[in-house]
Amino acid sequence: MIAEMQTMLGPLWPVAWNLLKIIAIVGPLMGAVAYLTLAERKVIGFMQVRMGPNRVGYRGLLQPLADGVKLLMKEIIIPSAASRTLFLLGPVLAIAPALAAWAVVPFDLTLVLADIDAGLLYILAMTSVGVYGVIIAGWASNSKYAFLGAMRSAAQIVSYEIAMGFALVGVLMSANSLNLGKIVLAQSGGFWEWYWLPLFPLFIVYFISAVAETNRAPFDVAEGESEIVAGFHVEYSGMAFAVFFLAEYANMILVAMLAALMFLGGWLSPVPFLPDSILWLLFKVAALLFFFLWFRATFPRYRYDQIMRLGWKVFIPVTLVWILFVGAMMQTRWAYLFH
């Protein structure tokens, strides 16, 4: 069938094939984002001894669809003093990098849209671009509250991005590659060969930085829904408002996926007698996402100064010290522990 389509489309075949691969990744991702919102409400409801959404569909399974329809029907109100073009561009710039980063994410040895050697560098670049959507949304709203929220959010994202990047440098040193597939294969050999063990401090710093990077509780001072309402998207409504949350949840899944690939062996089985499978990867991502939800239900929100102090005075020094330690150990007879 594929050969027939290739013959029929001729020179357009590569474009059509890439579009199909993009749809095959973005479609399930949007479904995962929608049901992650339901999982969050259900999990937090369980932790607070209540039921969560349970009215739409069987046990509330259609709640994300109802929420989507509701938001599509709502009007997008643009403030009269706002810059209309930039106001609408903000949500696009927030979600586009969150989706584009998935182009280089491998689900197994062959299931990847673009298997490039600089995959890790590409993902770090894409996650950096998302901050422009935040700044533009706050500035274009022409509201002092939105602009203040945007500045705080941008400062937090940039601060923790440094610590997160340094944490991944340790993985780069151990695997000696920027290709995500090769980094996973370098962890072959079972649970004790994965990088979470020799790079444990970097794994902890990466994961907590990822929580802060995605503006999730207890680092969600930019939104602060129980205190300051909405931060940089205070003036947004309808689908424009929803796109920011789609970007947030897409980024949550992305950083959890990256943690599973970098530190937890990706699709590799934890024991030699069980086969490698994409199901292992999905299980690891789901487990990491559960921690995002657990943190939100458990920890109180940090003050802004505490968040910045943690990033600059704790995480960045810890990652630098551990990178130096890994580099020094690689010059000794114990180098095999880090490869």
Curated annotation (Swiss-Prot):
Spans traversing the lipid bilayer = 19-39, 87-107, 120-140, 153-173, 191-211, 253-273, 275-295, 310-330
How the protein sits in the membrane? Multi-pass membrane protein
Q: Which reaction does it catalyse?
A: a quinone + NADH + 5 H(+)(in) = a quinol + NAD(+) + 4 H(+)(out)
Q: Which GO terms describe its molecular function?
A: NADH dehydrogenase activity; oxidoreductase activity, acting on NAD(P)H, quinone or similar compound as acceptor; quinone binding
Where does this protein reside within or beyond the cell? Cell inner membrane
UniProt xrefs under InterPro entries: NADH_UbQ_OxRdtase_su1/FPO (IPR001694), NADH_UbQ_OxRdtase_su1_CS (IPR018086)
Its keywords, alphabetically, are: Cell inner membrane, Cell membrane, Membrane, NAD, Quinone, Translocase, Transmembrane, Transmembrane helix, Ubiquinone
Enzyme Commission (EC) number: 7.1.1.-
* Family matches, as HAMAP family: NDH1_NuoH (MF_01350)
State whether it acts alone or in a complex, and with which partners, per the record.
NDH-1 is composed of 14 different subunits. Subunits NuoA, H, J, K, L, M, N constitute the membrane sector of the complex.
The record describes the protein's role as: NDH-1 shuttles electrons from NADH, via FMN and iron-sulfur (Fe-S) centers, to quinones in the respiratory chain. The immediate electron acceptor for the enzyme in this species is believed to be ubiquinone. Couples the redox reaction to proton translocation (for every two electrons transferred, four hydrogen ions are translocated across the cytoplasmic membrane), and thus conserves the redox energy in a proton gradient. This subunit may bind ubiquinone.
Sequence similarity: Belongs to the complex I subunit 1 family.
UniProt protein name: NADH-quinone oxidoreductase subunit H
List the top taxonomic levels of the source. Answer: Bacteria, Pseudomonadati, Pseudomonadota, Betaproteobacteria, Nitrosomonadales
The gene behind this protein is nuoH
